[in-house]
Amino acid sequence: MSGYQRRPGATPLSRARSLAIPDAPAFYERRSCLPQLNCERPHGRDLDSPFFGIRPAFMCYVPSPVLASVGDTDFGYGKGKCSKQSPSGAHGTHFGDDRFEDLEEANPFSFREFLKTKNLGLSKEDPASRIYAKEASRHSLGLDHNSPPSQTGGYGLEYQQPFFEDPTGAGDLLDEEEDEDTGWSGAYLPSAIEQTHPERVPAGTSPCSTYLSFFSTPSELAGPESLPSWALSDTDSRVSPASPAGSPSADFAVHGESLGDRHLRTLQISYDALKDENSKLRRKLNEVQSFSEAQTEMVRTLERKLEAKMIKEESDYHDLESVVQQVEQNLELMTKRAVKAENHVVKLKQEISLLQAQVSNFQRENEALRCGQGASLTVVKQNADVALQNLRVVMNSAQASIKQLVSGAETLNLVAEILKSIDRISEVKDEEEDS
């Protein structure tokens, strides 16, 4: 991916946390070779000053979703803590217990103090003790002494970079701070500085580059290398082609001015590119986060639907199981009823066979009765004639007896009347005797 080279095996968060921001004295020593992310000039200071009293204000935006995914929302680089957000939208980070106001007023390496001690240092010290070789600059960049000399980059850094001696012993303080912050020894370098030391960058593509290329196009992540050449080499024209050999202070001023302007331009360009990349990555991250939240909500909805469906299927399964059990019970009952019906049918068949035998017997009896009916009729007629004759004899005898009874009844009536009159006859006789 064109733009800034990534170290292999380092995520964007670990790269942001591996930024090595030096303290103020070491910062002024190594500012000629170590790039800063943001440089703020104090008010009322000359813009073309080679040492314009840079006040380090670390501006590196790390999105909160990335910190939340890692579980770390507190920056702690070395001894410092992240302060509240500045009006420009960046986080102004204070490192250690130093204050920017104190550094601006009582900094022995400010431009004001430098002008006071410049003439004395140039007159008393040897030029060899003032300007170190490339080994010192390489050591200030954190490179090994065994690494090959730096190659020419795209920013015109092919000359030897000066390293000014620290009269107050700030280098020892820097070494002590580097020993204390061994966990943050790695330094973030833009592609221009990293290309000057290609041995430190492996040939393979890091996982971070594939991660960023997934969300951004190569044109969006283009670094300072894709900028026009006039923006990078504009400050070269400000360097005077020739300087008086007998005025080392003028040579040093011109050299420092060109160096400071070049670094200011390159750092401003790299800062703008990083800011654009940061905003694009922030937008991409917001989109990815919203998409992830939508997908998570969709997954939760699908899980709820799946759970409801599973509960419904389980209830349906229990209902179906109960129905199957009921059907099995009904089948058992029907089987028992079928067995009973078969037994009843067998009994009915036996009864039918008995009834058929009885019917056959009755038919034979009817036939026998029909055959013997003619002989019985003649006998019956004869018996009826005899009975009629006997009845006639009885009737005749009955009439004669009836007549005798009627005559006897008349005699009986006469006797009854005579008996009634006997009482009267006796009473009359009694009356006659009394008289």
From Swiss-Prot:
Region feature Disordered, mapped onto this chain: 136-185, 225-251
Protein's cellular compartments: Cytoplasm; Early endosome; Endosome; Recycling endosome
Required for interaction with PTPN13: annotated span: 173-198
A biological-process GO annotation: cell projection organization
Taxonomy, superkingdom: Eukaryota
Coiled coil: 261-371
Signal peptide, first to last residue: none
Predominant location: cytoplasm
Keywords: Cell cycle, Cell division, Cell projection, Cilium biogenesis/degradation, Coiled coil, Cytoplasm, Cytoskeleton, Endosome, Phosphoprotein, Protein transport, Transport
Tissue-level expression: Expressed in the colon (at protein level).
UniProt biased composition (Acidic residues): 173-182
Chain positions with Phosphoserine modification: 18, 147, 243, 247
Transmembrane segment boundaries: none
Low complexity biased stretches: 240-250
Any one Gene Ontology cellular component term annotated for this protein: midbody
Post-translational modification: Phosphorylated.
Similarity comment: Belongs to the ENTR1 family.
Record text about domains: Tne N-terminal domain is necessary and sufficient for basal body localization and ciliogenesis.
Role this protein plays: Endosome-associated protein that plays a role in membrane receptor sorting, cytokinesis and ciliogenesis. Involved in the endosome-to-plasma membrane trafficking and recycling of SNX27-retromer-dependent cargo proteins, such as GLUT1. Involved in the regulation of cytokinesis; the function may involve PTPN13 and GIT1. Plays a role in the formation of cilia. Involved in cargo protein localization, such as PKD2, at primary cilia. Involved in the presentation of the tumor necrosis factor (TNF) receptor TNFRSF1A on the cell surface, and hence in the modulation of the TNF-induced apoptosis.
Quaternary context: Found in a complex with ENTR1, PTPN13 and GIT1. Interacts with PTPN13 (via the FERM domain). Interacts (via N-terminus) with GIT1 (via N- and C-terminus); this interaction is direct. Interacts with NOD2. Interacts (via N-terminus) with IFT88. Interacts with VPS35.
Record PANTHER family: ENDOSOME-ASSOCIATED TRAFFICKING REGULATOR 1, ENDOSOME-ASSOCIATED-TRAFFICKING REGULATOR 1
Name this polypeptide is given: Endosome-associated-trafficking regulator 1
Organism in which the protein naturally occurs: Homo sapiens
